[in-house]
Design a protein with these regions (language model features):
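Short hydrophobic-aromatic micro-motifs
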Residues: 52, 426-428
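Glycine-centered positions within short beta-strands or beta-hairpins
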Residues: 49, 423-424
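Active-site bordering "gate/hinge" segments
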Residues: 2-411, 433-517
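Short, loop-centered acidic/histidine patches that primarily coordinate divalent metals
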Residues: 421-423, 431-434
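A translation/RNA-centric and nucleic-acid-associated enzymatic feature enriched
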Residues: 411, 416-418, 428
Length: 517
C-alpha cells in the first residue's frame, strides 16, 4: 500500500499540471448578457495564455425571409414587427416604406408626419432603454462591479430612486404615443401603403405636445447624467479612447438633403475611415453597395461594401467593413438638425479629437446625443399644425412588383426589400438589419478587446465583462423574444483542453454569486 501512495501522488500532481497547462486554452462566455437575443463568445488562448482568436457567435437561426414568401405584401408590416419585441417599430416602419415603393404611392404630408412622430417617440424611448438598462450600467455602476449590480437596479442605487421613477415614467409616456397612433406599442398596426391607419385629432396632438416637452427635458437630464458619471471620470474616458476599443472603418447612415441625420427618411451616406464621403445612394440602389459574407461559426451574415470586396476581418481604408449605429450616424453627418443636439454633437467631437471618431465605446455618448435629437424632433412634429390634418392616406392603384424601404433603427441602418407577383404576394424577401451591417465590426471589436484585456491566462469576471462591453456598445439585436432581467442571467465560463474536454468552470448564478467547479 505504501508503495502505491507515491505513484498516486505523482499521478495527481501530473493531472493537476496537465489541467493547469490546458486551463488557459479556451474561454467560453455563454450566454452573453444585456442584449436583445442570444449569443456567445469563444476566446482561444495560445500557450502563453494570450488571446490568439476570439469569436462573437450568434447560435440561433431566424427564418423570417423564408416564411414571408407566399404571404400578402400588405401583411409584412405586421409580420416583420414580430422579429423583435424590443424594436418592432423599426421593422414595421421599414416594411411600410417598402410597401410605399412596392405600390408606387406617396403618403400625404400628414401621414409622413405621423409616421415620423411615432418613430421619434420610439427612438427616444429605445435609446433610453439602452442607456439606463443595457449599456449604461457598465459605466454608471462600473465595469468591474458585481454582475448582479450591473442593471437598472444598480443604476438606481447610484443615481437615486427618483431617477429610476423618472426613466420608467418617461418611457411609459413615449410608448403611449406609439399606442395612440399605432394601436399598440409592441406590434403596431399604424402603417399602410400610402399612409397610416388613423389620423391624430387636435386634442390628441395637445397631449402629445405635453409629452414631447417632457421628453426634451428628460433628454437634457440624461445627457447631464452621462457628463457627470462618465465624462467626469478620467478612467472611463481613458477606457473609451483606448486602443482596445478602437477600429478605423467606413461608416454608414441616413442623412437629409443637408447631410444631417434623419431616422425616418433620406439617402444613405457612407464616409471612409478618414471622414471623406465615399458614396451617397438611394435605398433602391443598396444592392450596388452592400453585400453579405458567410462564416461557418455564426448564423449572422457579415455585411461589407460591395465595391471594395470582402478582405477578411480587418479595418482600414482598403477593407469593405463598415459600421452603422449612433456613432456611425454622427460620423457621416455634417451637423445635427436640432439646436441642442448640435451643441452636444460639437462637444463630443471636440472632446474626442475631431471627426471621425472610431472609438467603439463612444457609441454610448453618440446614443445620448441622438436621444436628445429624437426628443427635439418629436417636439417639432408635435407642434406642426399639419400633424392633425385628416388626409392621411393615398390609395394605391399601381400593380406591385418590387419595393425597398430603409429607416435608421436604433442599432443602425435597416433595409426591407420585397419582390411580389402582380397580386402582391411575396416571392422574395431580403432583410438587412442593423446587426448584420455591424456584424463584422462587432466581431473585430470583441476580438481586439479580448486581446487587450486578457494576458498570461489571467481572467476574471470583470475582465470578461469588459470584453462584453465591446459588443454591448453596438446594442446588437439578435431578433429573439426571450429576455431576462439584466444582471440576473446566469453566466458560465468553461475552460476546455485541446481535445474539447472541460477542465474548469466558472459559474455565475442568478444571485450574482460565483462558483468554481
Amino acid at each position: 500500500m505504501s508503495s502505491e501512495m507515491p505513484t498516486q501522488e505523482a499521478w495527481r500532481r501530473g493531472a493537476e499540471g496537465a489541467q493547469a497547462a490546458y486551463t488557459r486554452r479556451r474561454i467560453t462566455i455563454d450566454p452573453i448578457t444585456r442584449l436583445e437575443g442570444h449569443g456567445k463568445i469563444d476566446i482561444f488562448l495560445d500557450d502563453a495564455g494570450d488571446v490568439d482568436r476570439a469569436y462573437f457567435q450568434v447560435p440561433e437561426l431566424r427564418g423570417f425571409e423564408k416564411f414571408a414568401q407566399g404571404r400578402p405584401a400588405e401583411d409584412m408590416p405586421q409580420i416583420t414587427s414580430r422579429i423583435c419585441g424590443v424594436c418592432p417599430t423599426a421593422h414595421h416602419m421599414a416594411a411600410t416604406k417598402a410597401l410605399d415603393a412596392l405600390y408606387q404611392v406617396e403618403p400625404p404630408p400628414a401621414a409622413r408626419r405621423i409616421r415620423e412622430l411615432v418613430y421619434s417617440a420610439f427612438m427616444t424611448e429605445d435609446h433610453a432603454l439602452h442607456f439606463y438598462f443595457l449599456g449604461g450600467p457598465d459605466f454608471v455602476v462600473g465595469p468591474e462591479a458585481p454582475a448582479a449590480q450591473r442593471n437598472i437596479l444598480g443604476v438606481i442605487g447610484v443615481v437615486g430612486q427618483e431617477v429610476g421613477v423618472r426613466v420608467i415614467a418617461m418611457r411609459r409616456r413615449l410608448r403611449e404615443i406609439i399606442t395612440l397612433a399605432g394601436g399598440k406599442v409592441i406590434h403596431p398596426v399604424l402603417g399602410l401603403p400610402g399612409g397610416v391607419a388613423r389620423r391624430i385629432t387636435a386634442e390628441e396632438q395637445a397631449q402629445i405636445r405635453e409629452t414631447a416637452d417632457e421628453a426634451v427635458e428628460f433628454a437634457k437630464f440624461t445627457l447631464g447624467v452621462f457628463r457627470s458619471v462618465v465624462l467626469a471620470n478620467p478612467a472611463y474616458v481613458d477606457l473609451i479612447v483606448s486602443d482596445a476599443f478602437t477600429h478605423r472603418t467606413y461608416c454608414m447612415g441616413l442623412v437629409d438633403g443637408q447631410n444631417r441625420p434623419n431616422f425616418y427618411d433620406g439617402q444613405v451616406r457612407v464616409v471612409n475611415p478618414d471622414g471623406a464621403e465615399w458614396a451617397t445612394f438611394k435605398a433602391a440602389d443598396y444592392l450596388d453597395y452592400v453585400a453579405e459574407h458567410v462564416e461557418p461559426w455564426s448564423y449572422v451574415k457579415f455585411c461589407y461594401l460591395k465595391p471594395l470586396g470582402w478582405q477578411g476581418f480587418k479595418d482600414g481604408i482598403d477593407s469593405g467593413i463598415y459600421s452603422v449605429a449612433p456613432l456611425a450616424r454622427l460620423n457621416v453627418a455634417d451637423s445635427m438638425a436640432t439646436p441642442l443636439a448640435q451643441e452636444a454633437y460639437e462637444e463630443m467631437f471636440a472632446t474626442l479629437g475631431g471627426k471621425p471618431v472610431h472609438h467603439t465605446l463612444a457609441n454610448h455618448w453618440a446614443r445620448v446625443i441622438e436621444l436628445l435629437y429624437a426628443a427635439e424632433r418629436l417636439k417639432e412634429l408635435a407642434d406642426d399644425p399639419e400633424l392633425s390634418d385628416p388626409n392621411v392616406r393615398t390609395l394605391p392603384t399601381a400593380t406591385p412588383r418590387e419595393g425597398i424601404g430603409v429607416v435608421e433603427a436604433p442599432r443602425g441602418t435597416l433595409f426591407h426589400h420585397y419582390v411580389t407577383d402582380a397580386r402582391g404576394i411575396v416571392e422574395q424577401a431580403n432583410l438587412i438589419v442593423a446587426t448584420q451591417n455591424n456584424a463584422a465590426r462587432i466581431a473585430m471589436s470583441v476580438e481586439k478587446a479580448a486581446k487587450g484585456m486578457i494576458s498570461n491566462g489571467t481572467v476574471s469576471e470583470g475582465i470578461l465583462n469588459k470584453v462584453e462591453m465591446a459588443f454591448r456598445a453596438y446594442d446588437p439585436c439578435h431578433a429573439c423574444a426571450t429576455h431576462s432581467l439584466p444582471g440576473s442571467m446566469p453566466l458560465v465560463v468553461a475552460v476546455r483542453g485541446s481535445g474539447g474536454e472541460t477542465l474548469s468552470v466558472l459559474r455565475r448564478d442568478a444571485d450574482g454569486s460565483l462558483h468554481h467547479e
